[in-house]
From Swiss-Prot:
<keyword id="KW-0464">Manganese</keyword>
<keyword id="KW-0378">Hydrolase</keyword>
<dbReference type="GO" id="GO:0005525">
    <property type="term" value="F:GTP binding"/>
</dbReference>
<comment type="similarity">
    <text>In the N-terminal section; belongs to the DHBP synthase family.</text>
</comment>
<keyword id="KW-0456">Lyase</keyword>
<keyword id="KW-0342">GTP-binding</keyword>
<feature type="binding site">
    <location>
        <begin position="258"/>
        <end position="262"/>
    </location>
    <ligand>
        <name>GTP</name>
    </ligand>
</feature>
<dbReference type="GO" id="GO:0009231">
    <property type="term" value="P:riboflavin biosynthetic process"/>
</dbReference>
<feature type="site" description="Essential for DHBP synthase activity">
    <location>
        <position position="168"/>
    </location>
</feature>
<dbReference type="Pfam" id="PF00925">
    <property type="entry name" value="GTP_cyclohydro2"/>
</dbReference>
<keyword id="KW-0862">Zinc</keyword>
<dbReference type="GO" id="GO:0008686">
    <property type="term" value="F:3,4-dihydroxy-2-butanone-4-phosphate synthase activity"/>
</dbReference>
<dbReference type="InterPro" id="IPR000926">
    <property type="entry name" value="RibA"/>
</dbReference>
<comment type="similarity">
    <text>In the C-terminal section; belongs to the GTP cyclohydrolase II family.</text>
</comment>
<comment type="function">
    <text>Catalyzes the conversion of GTP to 2,5-diamino-6-ribosylamino-4(3H)-pyrimidinone 5'-phosphate (DARP), formate and pyrophosphate.</text>
</comment>
<dbReference type="InterPro" id="IPR000422">
    <property type="entry name" value="DHBP_synthase_RibB"/>
</dbReference>
<feature type="active site" description="Nucleophile; for GTP cyclohydrolase activity">
    <location>
        <position position="337"/>
    </location>
</feature>
Length: 421
């Protein structure tokens, strides 16, 4: 991607302030698409007509979680199986003078305008309709690297109500427009084109998801660490997260890093259903041996579904569902974790380059999306036991984890597994 063809975030914000459209593209490892984005309170009927003619995608409006609650924009479905967890709500039309079927450029403009108007309320909209609201995650692109969050962040940065209009751009033949076509559209209509990656970097410098709360020393059976607790700034649940730090990160030498999500059953009670406790112990031991490193402990129990739902998933697994199917039966994706908070903690600690302890390739993509450089993946090799072998095979076969599940599990006793902890 030519840097000369990508505009600065500042220039795009200025255009949004002036009521212009911009093009926002994401990473080729994600959707590899471009969207027209505008501040919703600056939209005109002419702009809506232009977008429907030139973009050809689905006209959506990104709103904050709070705004969605205010307008009673409930999820479109209770069980979201969207590939990228796009958070659609029920579609709406404005109930306003001059609005007829809801589909005309003027009608859709009125709906967009009213979604952005702070004085609008739930009764101002009919359901379903022709505009598709999307709920952006609190924390914006620092929590989820998607066009939905980018639209809300950019509208707010432009001084507008944090509500953004967005629409995927399609090629003339109906296929998704990729970078070469998007650059032609940029030149043809004199539009700014930016990347979500650059927006993430911009927001990382100005917006905090976490703040240091307290720091202390913590001797453990795996070694001595500095323990730093972080408070979440943008999380409605106000969760705290931990960093176990060893050594100094002031040099450019890559740091050994483990980003570990909470697993109370495995980390504390040595559950044999998973390998989490063993991975935690192994990571701390490897960091101690290296003499320098950090373990980030994120409160994302059950791959993000929470402890109660994880235990419900265990019951489903006992009925024959695998770990992915159990999550889906409960209405969740296989993995709901986000790594934005972990990325900000690493940035706060001064980590620039890392050797990442993980078996999960999505974790690599997730962290790199926040501008962190991963120079090496360091595997965590834990021997399966007779209880968790099927679970690990599912993570390998369905979730892409790089795990060697070949072992003589008949020789792995519960005592052996506890000893590894």
């Amino acid at each position: 991607m030519s840097e000369k063809k990508i505009d600065s975030i500042e220039s795009a914000i200025e255009d949004l302030k002036n009521g212009k459209l911009i093009i926002v593209i994401d990473d080729e490892d994600r959707e590899d698409e471009g969207d027209f984005i505008a501040a919703a309170d600056k939209v005109t009927p002419e702009m809506v007509n232009f977008i429907t003619k030139e973009a050809r995608g689905l006209l959506c409006v990104a709103v904050t979680m709070d705004r969605a609650k205010e307008l009673q924009l409930d999820p479109m479905v209770q069980r979201n199986t969207s590939q990228h967890e796009t958070n659609f709500t029920v579609s709406v039309d404005a109930l306003a003078e001059g609005v007829t079927t809801g589909i005309s450029a003027f009608d859709r403009y009125m709906t967009i305008k009213m979604l952005a108007d702070p004085v609008s309320h739930a009764d101002n909209f009919s359901r379903p309709g022709h505009i598709f609201p999307l709920r952006a995650m609190d924390g914006g692109v620092l929590r989820r690297v998607g066009h939905t969050e980018a639209a809300v962040d950019l509208a707010e940065l432009a001084g507008s109500t944090p509500v953004g209009l967005l629409c995927e751009i399609l090629h003339d033949d109906g296929s998704m427009a990729r970078l070469p076509e998007l650059l032609k559209i940029k030149e043809k209509f004199d539009l700014k084109l930016i990347t979500i990656k650059d927006l993430v970097a911009y927001q990382m410098k100005r917006k905090k998801l976490v703040a240091r709360a307290v720091e202390t020393s913590l001797p453990t059976r795996h070694g001595d660490f500095r323990l730093i607790a972080y408070e979440a700034c943008c999380d409605s649940q106000q969760q705290n997260h931990l960093a176990f730090v060893k050594g100094d990160f002031s040099t450019d030498e890559p740091v050994l890093v483990r980003v570990h999500s909470q697993c109370a059953t495995g980390d504390i009670f040595a559950s044999l259903r998973c390998d989490c406790g063993n991975q935690l112990a192994s990571a701390m031991q490897q960091i101690e041996k290296a003499g320098k490193g950090v373990l980030i402990y994120l409160m994302q129990e059950g791959r993000g579904i929470g402890l109660i739902n994880k235990l419900k998933a265990y019951n489903l697994q006992d009925q024959g569902f695998d770990t992915v199917e159990a999550n889906e039966q409960l209405g969740f994706k296989a993995d709901l974790r986000d790594y934005g908070i972990g990325a900000q903690i690493l940035q706060d600690l001064g980590v620039k380059k890392m050797r990442l302890l993980t078996n999960n390739p999505k974790k690599i993509v997730g962290l790199e999306g926040y501008g962190l450089e991963i120079v090496e993946r360091v595997p965590i090799e834990i021997a399966p036991n007779s209880v968790n072998l099927s679970y690990l095979e599912t993570k390998r076969d369905k979730m892409g984890h790089m795990i060697n599940c070949s072992c003589n599990c008949s020789g792995v006793s519960q005592q052996d597994n506890h000893t590894q902890q």
